[in-house]
Structure formats: structure tokens, C-alpha cells
Amino acid sequence: MSVISMKQLLEAGVHFGHQTRRWNPKMKPFIFTERNGIYIIDLQKTVKLIDNAYNFVKDVAANDGVVLFVGTKKQAQTAIEEEAKRAGQYFVNHRWLGGTLTNWNTIQKRIKRLKDLKAMEEDGTFDRLPKKEVALLNKQKDKLEKFLGGIEDMPHTPDVLFVVDPRKEQIAIKEAQKLNIPVVAMVDTNSDPDQVDVIIPSNDDAIRAVRLITAKMADAVIEGRQGEDEEEASQEVAEGVSKDSLEDLKKSVEEGSNEE
């Protein structure tokens, strides 16, 4: 059973590619036909490849991996933030700052600054400062929040990137490649699939298409994490059982000795 049905993909407009004059020939294997000057994506392939992507992300999450959701184009911003939060993961939905991955130590310093400013606001420090200074600090805080708020609590560089539109997120993808971080991406007919490790051929411009697939990747994280939680719980039960068995064994040995 596929994680997304053909009907859902059709309703969300996942099959609509770009105009035929704006295409990347490497996407030819994923194109079904051309209609009114627009390429139509082969949804039979998309269904299978979404399953691949789902299982890949689920496995990463099951191993306590960190997933970074990336989509800075307007159509993706809301879905990227909401679905990453729902999955308990991290996101970049405004401009990707160069070095976010490759210069992680410097980025962490800027995140620390953001946390310090938030603490100053909460503990009443701002109330004791001149209004002009507070205005400047608030401006700085808002800017840092906009670009780094989604990765503020990310414990380390991610184990996988989920990207909406690799053409738009070139810098993020190049940084991931440098660090050997796998990339799962929604790839439209105008993108280069060779840049992506796990491809999802899809319309990456329609809000409904972006929401549908981003939500499914969030579901994969949640399912993977639930599997991990269940494994931990069963391990605890097993440890409890073996502990009880050991106690029972000791007890029976002691009782046997007493009888002698």
C-alpha cells in the first residue's frame, strides 16, 4: 500500500511540471507526456519514489537522526515550518545563510546571541535600557529569529535534508554534499535530479503539492520516532522481565538450599 494515493497526488496538482521550454533533459525519465506546452509528471513513478523517500526518512528518524526541512520560496514557507514543528524537527524557511552547515560553529555563535537576546527580553533587562538601544536589540533579535529560529535548538548538523525545489536551494544542497549529508527533494521538470540522493518528481510550485509531500515526510519522521519509542519501551520491559527472572532464580536456589 502506497503512503500517498494517485488520487491525492492528482488533486494536489503534483503532476503539473514546468513549460516545455523550461526543462532539464535529465528529468525525461520522470515525464509522462506534454499537454498545452506543459510537461506532465509520471505519477506512477512519483508514487513509488515517495514510498522510497518515506522509508528513507523513517529509517533516519528511527535511528534518532535529525531531519532539516528546507524551503525558502513563498509557496513552501508555511508548510515547511508547520510540518517540521509537527514532527519535532528543524527548518529553514527564509534565506539560507551561507555556511549554515559547513560553518556550523559560527552559526552556533549567532544562535547563542539569539538566545541571549531572548533571555534579556524575558528577564526584564530590556525594561532597564534606553528605548533606542532596545529598538536596535529587538531588530537584531527579529532578524536572527527569522533566519535561525528554525534551527535554534538543532543539536548538531542534520542527518538528512528534505528540500523543496533544489534549484532554489543550491547553496544548501552544495553544503550538504560537502558534508556527505543525504538530500531528499521535491524535484520539478526544470531541476537537475543528479544533485539529489532521494528524488520525488513533483510540482514544487503549487502550495497544495508542497503541503501534501512535506506533510508526508513529517509523517515518516513521526512513524520512525514512534518505532524508536516502542523499541525502547519493549527493551525496558525485556530488561524488567530478565531482572524478575533472575530474582526468581535466586529465590528458588535459596529456597532449595534452605530445604537441604
From Swiss-Prot:
Residue span of region Disordered: 223-260
Any Pfam family: Ribosomal_S2
Keyword Ribosomal protein (UniProt): yes
Chain intervals with Basic and acidic residues compositional bias: 241-254
UniProt entry tagged with the keyword Ligase: no
Gene3D superfamilies: Glucose-6-phosphate isomerase like protein, domain 1, Helix hairpin bin
Highest taxon listed in the record's lineage: Bacteria
GO molecular function list: structural constituent of ribosome
GO CC, one annotated term: cytosolic small ribosomal subunit
Gene Ontology biological process terms from the UniProt entry: translation
SUPFAM superfamilies: Ribosomal protein S2 (SSF52313)
Signal peptide: none
UniProt keyword list: Ribonucleoprotein, Ribosomal protein
Family: Belongs to the universal ribosomal protein uS2 family.
Protein name per UniProt: Small ribosomal subunit protein uS2
Organism of origin: Pediococcus pentosaceus (strain ATCC 25745 / CCUG 21536 / LMG 10740 / 183-1w)
Gene: rpsB
